[in-house]
Amino acid sequence: MSAYRRPAGLNDALGRLSAEPHRIIAGGTDVFPAAAAAVGWGRPGIDHPGRAPILDITAIEALSHIRRFPDRVEIGALVTWTEAIESDLPAWFDGVRQAAREVGGRQIQNRGTLAGNLCNASPAADGVPALLALDARVRLRRRGGSRDVPLESFITGNRRTCLRPEELMTTIVIPSPAPGARSTFLKLGARRYLVISIAMVAAGLEVRDGRIRGARIAVGACSEVARRLTRLEARLEGTRPEDAPGGVREEDFASLSPLNDVRASAAYRRHGARVLVTRALGALVHGEGAAR
């Protein structure tokens, strides 16, 4: 069977990655179900001798932090959804907390990590739009160096990222917003819980002197990669918050390329995204940061 390694320190992990490619595991909530499905279809499983060795990073304590700085918040690669929900982060992170509550069941939330959700790069990953709406970037470490990559550049396609074989995502970095900024997250699915998204939306607003001074709106599950609605964001700049929900237009969604599949038609996804954006902006205007 393939090798299994569980380093206790970050340098050890980076050294192993520099020597040969590994399959990295944190919570394992995506890797193991995918491997089981592969076996069911007659393909090699996770322990097949021909597969790359497994690198389990769960013993690296340096990756289990949430740290606050004057200009940013850093979320370590081992921070779970439950830890995000229970954190004392400000209202700017309400959208992340709401997305965390939508990820699977309690067991998945206790094991799964935000960083793993980003690295899995599913078009329907709940964490991606929530973090895109916060201008998140990811820190990729390698032996002897590191680089910070904007989240919108990190995910390059359906389950594809720019992570190199010798790199490990160690941190999610979120810039600190203006005081009073809020975010929210809304999801459309075939049922209320334990569902893969048909469409989802995260939105964040910074308001000063009665005007919007920063709007960030991201849509997931409506393209191969979650996307920011930059046209709408630009138009909302300088407007009154109460006018934002009524300012959503059909052309704001031109950058999306929703699929027709067993969950929904492309037209339904696009319509659902517009409804969710309007509702999310309305929730923020009325002070409902964690709208449901």
Model-derived regions: residue spans:
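C-terminal structural segment of proteins
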Residues: 1-292
